[in-house]
Amino acid sequence: GSGKSTLFKLICGLYQPSEGTVRIFGRAPESIPEEERRKVFGLVEQQFKPVSGNMRDQITLSDPSIFEKDVRRALAETGILPAIEDLPEGLDTPYDPGLLSQGQFQLLSIARATVTNPPLLLLDEITANLDSVTEKQVLDALRAASVKRTVLSISHRLFEAAGGRQVRIGH
């Protein structure tokens, strides 16, 4: 490849550069404490990665410092709040992979990434496995989530549809 995923791993502090430096808001990413990283950047990956617990835990990752109002704001911002409220126990519904469609889980991923209101949003092929109707829903949610944030995206199609400045790396 051309290093797109490596670039994200450098930004997230998972890799250290062999030459030069990486700075996120003036700080080396690897120096940002784990508990603070979600407040600096939100990461949305191609596949939703569930955690044990209920639907609230899927957003908060069991972080007690995240308030209910923040969870609801993130869900409303992405348009997935009505679907969550329709679940038998709402946010308290135990996680099950059959509860939502693949596209709805991508919306949940965006809510997870934005619940702490980070200034940087990293998107890794988030529309790659979606049909065109679901892709439009995800892109609409992304437009809302992108307000007042810097967005870096690895995608073959995303910014063509979403509108935005492009920096191309590789093919």
List PLM regions with ranges.
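Conserved ABC transporter NBD signature motif
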Residues: 20-28, 37
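Helix-to-loop junction immediately C-terminal to a conserved catalytic motif
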Residues: 12
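Conserved catalytic loops of ABC-family nucleotide-binding domains
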Residues: 141-155, 159-163
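Catalytic Walker B motif of ABC-type/P-loop ATPase nucleotide-binding domains
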Residues: 121-125
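Conserved "ABC signature" C-loop
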Residues: 48-94
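Conserved catalytic motifs of ABC-family nucleotide-binding domains
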Residues: 117
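Walker A (P-loop) phosphate-binding loop of ABC-type ATPase nucleotide-binding domains
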Residues: 2-3
